[in-house]
Structures are given as structure tokens and as C-alpha cells.
């Protein structure tokens, strides 16, 4: 009976230790993806979108004219692709 209690205690202690170790390693790993994503999606001045004289797809067309290949939606006031069913 004592042997069974000791083995259950050791098993439980081992599971607790495994949980603590995995939690510690996971908390360290959580910072890595955040740092990696922030470096990937960092906005660089060379890659910023240039200001256009026309509005592109799904851009507001109240003040600007739509770029070639797009028309201003009369309902939503966005630049959309022209289609036969749109008036």
C-alpha cells in the first residue's frame, strides 16, 4: 500500500514538473513570434504606398477620380470594377 502511494506521489510530482517546464518554455516562445512578426511587417519608408492622383480598388471616390479600369459606385462611393449589371 505504501509503495502504491509513493509511486502515485512521484507520478503526480512528475506531471507537475512537466507542466511547469512546458509552461516556462511556452512563455519564452510566445515572445519570439511577436518579435518575428513585428520585424516582418515593419513599415519601411521605401515600401510606403505613394500618393496617387487617382483612387484604386475599394478606395473612396468622392474627391478623387478612380484609376483606369475602375468606376465610382453610385451607391457606396467606392472605386469598383465595371460590370454589365452596374449602372
From Swiss-Prot:
It comes from the Eukaryota. Transmembrane segments: none annotated. Disulfide bonds join 54-67, 61-72, 66-79. Keywords: Disulfide bond, Ion channel impairing toxin, Knottin, Secreted, Signal, Toxin. Residues 25-52 form a propeptide. One of its GO terms (cellular component) is extracellular region. InterPro entries: Huwentoxin-1, Huwentoxin_CS1. Its main location: secreted. GO terms for molecular function: ion channel inhibitor activity; toxin activity. Expressed by the venom gland. Residues 1-24 form the signal peptide. SUPFAM superfamilies: omega toxin-like. It is found in: Secreted. Belongs to the neurotoxin 10 (Hwtx-1) family. 51 (Hntx-8) subfamily. Hntx-8 sub-subfamily. Ion channel inhibitor. The presence of a 'disulfide through disulfide knot' structurally defines this protein as a knottin. This is U3-theraphotoxin-Hhn1a 7.
Amino acid at each position: 500500500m505504501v509503495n502504491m502511494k509513493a509511486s502515485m506521489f512521484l507520478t503526480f510530482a512528475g506531471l507537475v514538473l512537466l507542466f511547469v517546464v512546458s509552461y516556462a518554455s511556452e512563455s519564452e516562445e510566445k515572445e519570439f513570434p511577436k518579435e518575428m512578426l513585428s520585424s516582418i511587417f515593419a513599415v519601411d519608408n521605401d515600401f510606403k504606398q505613394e500618393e496617387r492622383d487617382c483612387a484604386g480598388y475599394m478606395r473612396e471616390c468622392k474627391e478623387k477620380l478612380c484609376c483606369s479600369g475602375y468606376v465610382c459606385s453610385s451607391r457606396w462611393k467606392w472605386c469598383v470594377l465595371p460590370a454589365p449589371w452596374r449602372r
